[in-house]
Amino acid sequence: MKKQALDPEAKTKPHIIEHLGISALRSTHPEVRKLKRQQSGHSAHGNKVWRSSFVLMDYLTTYPPEPASQVLDVGCGWGLTSIFLAKEYAANVTGLDIDSGVEPFLQLQAQVNQCEINFQCGGFESLTATELLAFDLIIAADICFWDEMVDPLLDLFRDA
């Protein structure tokens, strides 16, 4: 897989990361900082742009979904991979996250990138096989950070 370099002009845009046509606002961006001041905190690491989103975006350029796919982004966080799929492949993306506090950040990122992402607050372990059938593709990046998540993730893969 060819590695995609991040924006070489990053020094002129210190609060934005440009990658594969997506503008990702960093946690230092004034609008992001404003949202952070309005919240009491995050419970599940949804507090910044995670580099794993860019790795997954790179992967998806090599193995793209069908255009206009129904996509579930498990542990979507600020939604950068969701935004990439919506913009690049006209995907209808639902971002799922256990942290309701990420939704304003996801919507801000989507607004900056002129696309829409559906947000659903909840855990993947509660999704049924029937619910999963509504999606053509299920993606996730950097979500297995607690040992007790391994078995529920395996169940998700089996049900999908």
Where are the regions a protein language model picked out?
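S-adenosylmethionine-dependent methyltransferases
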Residues: 1-160
